[in-house]
């Protein structure tokens, strides 16, 4: 057991040539190693084997408590009671000895009849200067366990992930070292709890919020002076009992993070979306934000202004990815308001279906300095023979676009017309990259032959097929 752990340690540290020289002539030389090295070796063993080492001798009795990382999954135990028993023994034993736990990952899957115990465990470890905490409770939202008050004032936490837990009210919150926080499908006492949790992290850099329906948060407010990366995802959860009558009009998202550089936004459930102080924003990934109903009501001027302001707030980025759903929204939006100018945008990745492909020149016209374009063409088979006519040639095709990459390209008429459009009208294009999808090598040969026969606006353009 120890020898296997030793070999894994040596292989990880020194590579394949390392030799197991600490077991020679039946002599146990590992026990003579310093505690710090033994604990590193123990990390390469399953948790059950790590605990078993405590029975080897008095030298080993409490060594396993010195391991800096602990990864526990209730599924790896005989049943949930065995899992609970192990954790209780760990806490009892740790109360008598000084533990050096730096990182804890805890995954709990329990049924209705299983007793709650995660709260007590988390309270125990965060009081002992834990730095990295990952808690995953895979239960129905009716049986979520509440996080202890001690978690909100842990002055050593650097990374925190909470999945399907309850965050209740607290009198104080202070997480002075927390840099990364991932909150997934949790339930909160109210809006203030989540807002205060975020704003009370003075060095927070990365924040991910995956919300579920009925999480008790009407308006998500993200206020942070240090945040550089933000991912917001609000969808209907799986396996939950949903409550009818969700009021979109009173729900919203407010982001005020002046140092924010990266934003991924996937939320079409909230009614209002507002971003302020977005001057540092450089990269966005827009999945779900709006739909055609958000701009079709010409009477609802405040709502149309909200949509316009959101688009303007992300218009200064240099790198943008937009989903098929967002392209569909822009298709309808163009009939009511012009798109803002994305003058700094140099890289764009877009998922586009044939039905909304005519919006492509309009999108490109709003990106006058675009250099790189990646397109994922999501066409249905029956659409691929439909004729396509592009109405205009945007400025970026003439003066700045250097690289075009088309994924899911099969040479059918509709997709061939897209390739022709860029080859013929791009004045400074350096390369056209096509990710070819065809059933035979012969089909690929004829597709490439047709591509090479197309006229080119740039004499230096290369066609790359992969």
Swiss-Prot record:
Residues 385-436 form the FBD domain. SUPFAM superfamilies: F-box domain, RNI-like. InterPro entries: F-box-like_dom_sf (IPR036047), F-box_AtFBL13-like (IPR053781), F-box_dom (IPR001810), FBD (IPR006566), FBL13/AtMIF1-like (IPR050232), LRR_dom_sf (IPR032675), LRR_FXL15/At3g58940/PEG3-like (IPR055411). Residues 27-80 form the F-box domain. This is FBD-associated F-box protein At5g22730. It comes from Arabidopsis thaliana (Mouse-ear cress). The lineage of its organism: Eukaryota, Viridiplantae, Streptophyta, Embryophyta, Tracheophyta.
């Amino acid at each position: 057991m120890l020898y296997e752990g030793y070999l894994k340690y040596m292989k990880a540290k020194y590579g394949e040539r390392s030799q197991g020289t600490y077991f020679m002539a039946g002599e146990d030389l590992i026990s003579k190693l310093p505690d710090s090295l033994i604990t590193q070796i123990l990390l390469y063993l399953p948790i059950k084997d790590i605990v078993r080492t405590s029975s080897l001798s008095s030298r080993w009795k409490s060594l396993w408590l010195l391991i800096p990382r602990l990864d526990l999954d209730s599924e790896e135990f005989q049943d949930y009671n065995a899992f609970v028993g192990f954790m209780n023994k760990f806490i009892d034993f740790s109360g008598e000895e000084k533990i050096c736990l730096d990182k804890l990952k805890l995954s709990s899957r329990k049924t209705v009849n299983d007793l709650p115990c995660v709260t007590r465990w988390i309270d125990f470890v965060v009081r002992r200067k834990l730095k990295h905490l990952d808690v995953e409770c895979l239960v129905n939202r009716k049986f979520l366990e509440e996080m202890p008050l001690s978690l909100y004032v842990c002055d050593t936490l650097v990374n925190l992930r909470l999945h399907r837990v309850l965050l209740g009210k607290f009198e104080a919150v202070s997480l002075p070292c927390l840099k990364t926080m991932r909150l997934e499908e949790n339930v909160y006492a109210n809006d203030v709890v989540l807002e205060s949790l975020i704003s009370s992290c003075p060095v927070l850099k990365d924040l991910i919020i995956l919300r579920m329906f009925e999480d008790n948060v009407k308006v998500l407010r993200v206020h942070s002076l240090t945040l550089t990366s933000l991912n917001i995802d609000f969808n209907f959860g799986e396996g939950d009992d949903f409550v009818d009558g969700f009021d979109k009009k009173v729900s919203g998202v407010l982001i005020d993070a002046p140092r924010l550089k990266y934003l991924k936004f996937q939320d079409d459930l909230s009614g209002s979306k507002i971003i302020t102080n977005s001057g540092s924003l450089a990269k966005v990934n827009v999945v779900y934000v709006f739909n055609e109903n958000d701009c079709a009501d010409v009477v609802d001027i405040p709502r149309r202004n909200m949509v316009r302001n959101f688009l303007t707030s992300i218009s200064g980025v240099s790198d943008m990815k937009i989903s098929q759903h967002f392209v569909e929204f822009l298709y309808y939006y163009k009939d009511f308001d012009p798109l803002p100018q994305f003058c700094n945008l140099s890289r764009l990745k877009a998922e586009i279906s044939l039905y909304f492909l005519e919006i492509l020149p309009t999108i490109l016209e709003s990106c006058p300095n675009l250099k790189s374009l990646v397109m994922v063409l999501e066409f249905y088979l029956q659409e691929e023979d439909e004729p396509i006519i592009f109405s205009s040639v945007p400025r970026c095709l003439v003066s700045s676009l250097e690289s075009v990459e088309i994924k899911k390209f099969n040479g059918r008429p509709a997709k061939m017309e897209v390739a022709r459009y860029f080859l013929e009208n791009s004045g400074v294009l350096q390369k056209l990259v096509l990710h070819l999808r065809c059933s035979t090598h012969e089909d690929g040969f004829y597709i490439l032959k047709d591509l090479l026969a197309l006229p080119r606006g740039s004499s230096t353009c290369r066609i790359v097929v992969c």
